């Protein structure tokens, strides 16, 4: 079994590709990934709360203390969005499709920053980019 990731800049953000190759003789199923975006060291985002998070699966976004700077991430195929205030962090966790012997499965991810107040409009703009295809 092998896996890897590739990250490339595009459209003002990062497009991420994660892959899993099944070189075993057994099928792999129910493989979930936790991708944690931690804010502890990011000035303005380090507040330990979930009140600054917006969940629009597969997207999750977090704003700074002023509510004008946002970090946005998403992964597909999507399994769940969640946040952990004590960290503080946010997750858009994907799940690999079942992977038969000899197969390779892929996940697609996005990360970007946004400055402004129309976060829903920005998320729609990101969706319209088609980064997950």
Where are these regions (language model features)?
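Extended, loop-rich substrate-binding clefts of extracytoplasmic carbohydrate-active enzymes
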Residues: 1-11
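Beta-strand-rich recognition/accessory modules
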Residues: 63-133
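Beta-strand secondary-structure signal
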Residues: 4, 15-19, 106-110
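Acidic (Asp/Glu-rich), glycine- and aromatic
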Residues: 9-49
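A contiguous pocket-lining binding segment that forms or flanks enzyme active sites
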Residues: 40-64
């Amino acid at each position: 079994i092998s896996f890897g990731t590739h990250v490339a800049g595009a459209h003002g953000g990062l497009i991420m590709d994660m892959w899993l190759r099944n070189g075993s003789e057994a099928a792999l199923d129910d493989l979930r990934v936790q991708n944690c975006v931690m804010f502890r060291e990011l000035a303005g985002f380090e507040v330990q709360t979930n009140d600054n998070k917006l969940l629009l699966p597969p997207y999750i976004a977090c704003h700074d203390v002023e509510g004008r700077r946002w970090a946005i991430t998403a992964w597909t195929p999507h399994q769940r969005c969640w946040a952990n205030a004590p960290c503080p962090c946010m997750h858009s966790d994907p799940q690999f499709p079942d992977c038969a012997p000899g197969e390779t499965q892929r996940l697609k991810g996005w990360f970007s920053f946004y400055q402004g107040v129309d976060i829903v409009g920005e998320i729609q703009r990101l969706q319209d980019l088609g980064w997950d295809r």
